[in-house]
Regions:
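H-loop/switch region of ABC-family ATPase nucleotide-binding domains
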Residues: 201-202, 449-450
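Conserved ABC ATPase signature
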Residues: 141-145, 149, 389-393, 397
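Catalytic Walker B motif of ABC-type/P-loop ATPase nucleotide-binding domains
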Residues: 166-169, 414-417
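Helix-to-loop junction immediately C-terminal to a conserved catalytic motif
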Residues: 53, 317
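Conserved ABC ATPase "signature" region
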Residues: 119-137, 370-385
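ABC-family nucleotide-binding domains
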Residues: 176, 424
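Conserved ABC transporter NBD signature motif
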Residues: 61-74, 325-339
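ABC ATPase C-loop
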Residues: 159, 406-407
Length: 467
C-alpha cells in the first residue's frame, strides 16, 4: 500500500531540553487521507507536524533519531526549501506566516518565490480565489480583516503551489463558528481532490465528517490509532480520561442559549454605558449596548470574528480609551489608570506577556501572594516546568503560565481573551476550577471566547455581541 508519510522509530528532543518531545514514533499516512493528531497539551502533536513540513530540526533545532519521510524527503537531511512545493502549512496564529500586507500579494508570494512567470501567477491566484470564494477578501490590508478571514487567506496561500500534503496546527483556536464552517468546507474541498491533510487539533466536533483516522499522542508517544468509526464509538468516559474534547456540541449550544443575557442579577461592580470603541475617530469599530458585571460571577463574551470583543477587553482593562461613553467601577467613572490598577488581562497571544527566564519567575512577576505559587502551579500542571524558559513551552503551557500569573495577581477584575487556544480538556478543567475559586473570592471574571464548550461549562451567563 502506498504511503505519503512514513515514520520509523522517530524520537526528537529540542535543543537545550532534557526531556524528549517525541519517543519512538512509527506511523504511515496514505495519499488522500485526512488524519487528526490529538492528545493533551504538550503531548507532541505540534512537534511531529514540524517534522512533516521541515521546520524541525532545521528551524527548531534538536536531536532527531529514526527516520521520517514525506514523499521521499527525509527530515533532518532535506532542506526546508525542498518541502515548499510538497507541503503547505497553516498555523494556529496566521499572523506568524504572513509575508505581505496585502491579501492578493500574500497569495501570489509562494508562486513568486518558486519562479513562476507573472501571467501564470495571476492565473493561479484567480483559480484559487474562485475555488475558495475569496473574491471579497482580495486587495485588502491584512491588518483590516478578521482572524477568520486571515485564516482563510493563509489556507489558500498554503494551497497555491498544489502541495501533496497540508499540515494544519490548531487552525480553529481563534475562530468563531462561522469561520470554522468555512475552514471545514475548504478542507473538505481539498480532500475531495485527493490532497493529504494532517490536523493537530484539540477541538474535535467541527471536523469529524472529514477525518479518516485519529492518532492519539501521550507524553511524546503514539499510544492509539482509531479509524473514524472506532473513534465515534468510544465512550465519553474514554474521551474524558484521555483529555479529549467533546464530539458533539448540541447540549453546549442549548446551555448557551439559556445563559445569554446582558445584565447581571447581582449588584454591578463594573458598568459599561453608551460605549463606542475604535482605534481612532476614522476607524469606528462598534457602538456597544449597555452591560454590567457583578463581583463573584464569570461572564462569557461571545460574537463573531471582528465584532470588537478583544478591543472591548483592552478598553475594560485600561489599555485603550473608548471613543465615547463611560466605564464605571463601583458607580464611579473609572479612567484608564484606575482600570489598569483593577484588572489583569490574559491576552489572546500570550507571547506578548512572557518576560522572565523561568516559568516560576514569570508567575511571580506582580504576584500579590507569592507563597501560593507552588499551589497554583500544581493546580495547573506546571510544577514540572518551574525552571523551563517560558518561550520553550508549547502554546497551551504558555497559556497556563499567564493564567497562573493572573490567579496570583489578586486583581478584582480578570479578563481572559481566548484562554482555551492550545488547552486540552484536562487543562480546561484545571483552569475552570481555579476560576471558580476566584469567583468565590468575589472576583469578576470576563472570558472572551468563541469556544462553545468552554462558555457553556465555565460561564454563569453569556453576553452575545451582535451587529
Amino acid at each position: 500500500m502506498r504511503t505519503l508519510v512514513e515514520s520509523n522509530n522517530v524520537s526528537f528532543a529540542y535543543q537545550n531540553s532534557t526531556e524528549p518531545a517525541l519517543q519512538d514514533i512509527s506511523l504511515r499516512i496514505r495519499p488522500g487521507e485526512c488524519v487528526l493528531f490529538c492528545g493533551r497539551s504538550g503531548c507532541g502533536k505540534t512537534t511531529f507536524s514540524r517534522l512533516l513540513n521541515g521546520l524541525a530540526p532545521m528551524f527548531y533545532p534538536g536531536e532527531l533519531t529514526g527516520s521520517c519521510t514525506v514523499s521521499g524527503l527525509l527530515a533532518g537531511s532535506a532542506a526546508i526549501e525542498q518541502y515548499v512545493p510538497l507541503v503547505g502549512s497553516v498555523f494556529q496564529n496566521p499572523k506568524t506566516q504572513y509575508f505581505n500586507v496585502d491579501t492578493t500579494a500574500e497569495l501570489a508570494f509562494p508562486c513568486e518565490n518558486s519562479g513562476m512567470p507573472p501571467t501564470a501567477i495571476r492565473q493561479r491566484v484567480q483559480e484559487v480565489v474562485a475555488q475558495f470564494h475569496l473574491e471579497a477578501l482580495m486587495d485588502r490590508s491584512v491588518f483590516k480583516i478578521s482572524g477568520g478571514e486571515k485564516q482563510r487567506v493563509a489556507f489558500a496561500a498554503a494551497c497555491m503551489l498544489g502541495p501533496k500534503l497540508l499540515v494544519l496546527d490548531e487552525p480553529t483556536s481563534n475562530l468563531d463558528a462561522g469561520a470554522i464552517r468555512q475552514l471545514h468546507d475548504m478542507i473538505a474541498a481539498m480532500k475531495q481532490v485527493g490532497m493529504t491533510i494532517v490536523l493537530a487539533e484539540h477541538r474535535l466536533a467541527w471536523v469529524q465528517d472529514v477525518v479518516d483516522r485519529y492518532f492519539f499522542f501521550e507524553a511524546g508517544q503514539l499510544t492509539a490509532v482509531w479509524t473514524a468509526a472506532d473513534f465515534a464509538a468510544l465512550p465519553e468516559t474514554t474521551l474524558q480520561n484521555a483529555g479529549l474534547r467533546a464530539r458533539d456540541l448540541t447540549a453546549c449550544r442549548e446551555k448557551l442559549r439559556q445563559k445569554t443575557t446582558m445584565q447581571c442579577t447581582g449588584v454591578p461592580i463594573l458598568e459599561v454605558q453608551n460605549l463606542t470603541l475604535g482605534y481612532h475617530r476614522r476607524s469606528l469599530i462598534r457602538a456597544l449596548p449597555d452591560m454590567s458585571f457583578a463581583a463573584g460571577e464569570i461572564v462569557g463574551l461571545m460574537g463573531h470574528n471582528g465584532i470588537g470583543k478583544s478591543t472591548l477587553a483592552k478598553t475594560l482593562c485600561g489599555l485603550m480609551e473608548p471613543l465615547g461613553g463611560q466605564i464605571l467601577w463601583e458607580g464611579k467613572t473609572a479612567n484608564a489608570r484606575t482600570r489598569l490598577h483593577k484588572s489583569f488581562l490574559v491576552m489572546q497571544d500570550v507571547n506578548y506577556q512572557l518576560f522572565s527566564d523561568s516559568v516560576r519567575e514569570e508567575i511571580l512577576l506582580g504576584a500579590a501572594h507569592p507563597k501560593l505559587v507552588d499551589t497554583v502551579m500544581q493546580a495547573l500542571g506546571l510544577n514540572g516546568l518551574a525552571d523551563r524558559h517560558p518561550m520553550s513551552l508549547s502554546g497551551g503551557q504558555k497559556q497556563r503560565v499567564v493564567v497562573a500569573a493572573a490567579m496570583l495577581s489578586d486583581k478584582p477584575l480578570i479578563l481572559l481573551d481566548e484562554p482555551t487556544s492550545g488547552l486540552d480538556r484536562g487543562n480546561m478543567e484545571q483552569v475552570r476550577r481555579l476560576l471558580q475559586q476566584l469567583k468565590t473570592q468575589g472576583k469578576t471574571i470576563v472570558v472572551i471566547t468563541h469556544d462553545e464548550e468552554l462558555a457553556a461549562d465555565w460561564c454563569d451567563r453569556i453576553i452575545a455581541l451582535q451587529d
